Amino acid sequence: MIGKVAGILDFRGPDHVLIDVRGVGYIVYVSDRTLASMPGLGEAVALYTELVVREDLLQLFGFPTMIEKEWHRLLMTVQGVGAKAGMAILGALGAEGTARAITLGDARSIQAAPGIGPKIAQRVVLELKSKAPALMAMGGGTAALAPSEPPEPQPGTSSGSRRKTRAPEPPRPSHTADALSALANLGYQPTDAAQAVAQAAGESPDADTAALIRAALKLLAPKS
């Protein structure tokens, strides 16, 4: 199983990239969102990967974070959602947006992904709603992979033929998982907590952990 590919970005296609790992090129299919975030050609890149095996085809699908990879695997458990459909959903919504849509039962947002019809979107929401809290709580493992050091130049090539790698930006911390953990410690059921946190995060995307907890508690408070 190939779980991670790190090397030099050698080619960028409409739905895939070619990553050179010490002279071996790996074709990795990525979502539109991930493709847009790729560095320039000749720069270091690293992706978590999932190997999808068919009778006559092996394909690698790449993800910037482990949580996005896990969402892709979960999406493919839904009948009618294949690897490319899962990538379309993640490309349209991202991992957090997918989690929020499923938790809130928002099939229309799922349907906004290319190639996803209303029946499939509704099935995704119904089948995965109870499983969303567990993945949302994986926030500690959502950090994006930092590009590895570039491989040593191959014989016959100069080090100047590769661009210098840029220092990776520090990943934005996930406050969702911390808020979910706090609500769980307060005794709230995972599904209820996930729905409240998802709604709060959707209304205030830049909220920190404390703000998410306060907003979620207001949503969970008994209505008079």
Curated annotation (Swiss-Prot):
Domain II as annotated region, ranges: 65-143
Domain of life: Bacteria
Cysteines joined through disulfide linkages: none
Residues covered by region (Flexible linker): 144-170
Start and end residues of each stretch annotated as Disordered: 141-185
Single annotated GO MF: ATP binding
Coiled coil: none
Region of interest (Domain III), residue spans: 171-224
Pfam families per the UniProt record, alphabetical: HHH_5, RuvA_C, RuvA_N
Locations listed in the record: Cytoplasm
Region entry Domain I, spans: 1-64
CDD domains, A to Z: UBA_RuvA_C
Subcellular location, principal: cytoplasm
Keywords: Cytoplasm, DNA damage, DNA recombination, DNA repair, DNA-binding
Keyword Transmembrane helix: no
SUPFAM superfamilies from the UniProt entry: DNA helicase RuvA subunit, C-terminal domain, Nucleic acid-binding proteins, RuvA domain 2-like
One annotated Gene Ontology cellular component of this protein: Holliday junction helicase complex
GO biological process: DNA recombination; DNA repair
Family: Belongs to the RuvA family.
Free-text domain note: Has three domains with a flexible linker between the domains II and III and assumes an 'L' shape. Domain III is highly mobile and contacts RuvB.
Function: The RuvA-RuvB-RuvC complex processes Holliday junction (HJ) DNA during genetic recombination and DNA repair, while the RuvA-RuvB complex plays an important role in the rescue of blocked DNA replication forks via replication fork reversal (RFR). RuvA specifically binds to HJ cruciform DNA, conferring on it an open structure. The RuvB hexamer acts as an ATP-dependent pump, pulling dsDNA into and through the RuvAB complex. HJ branch migration allows RuvC to scan DNA until it finds its consensus sequence, where it cleaves and resolves the cruciform DNA.
Subunit structure, interactors included: Homotetramer. Forms an RuvA(8)-RuvB(12)-Holliday junction (HJ) complex. HJ DNA is sandwiched between 2 RuvA tetramers; dsDNA enters through RuvA and exits via RuvB. An RuvB hexamer assembles on each DNA strand where it exits the tetramer. Each RuvB hexamer is contacted by two RuvA subunits (via domain III) on 2 adjacent RuvB subunits; this complex drives branch migration. In the full resolvosome a probable DNA-RuvA(4)-RuvB(12)-RuvC(2) complex forms which resolves the HJ.
Protein name, entry field: Holliday junction branch migration complex subunit RuvA
Organism: Cereibacter sphaeroides (strain KD131 / KCTC 12085)
Gene label: ruvA
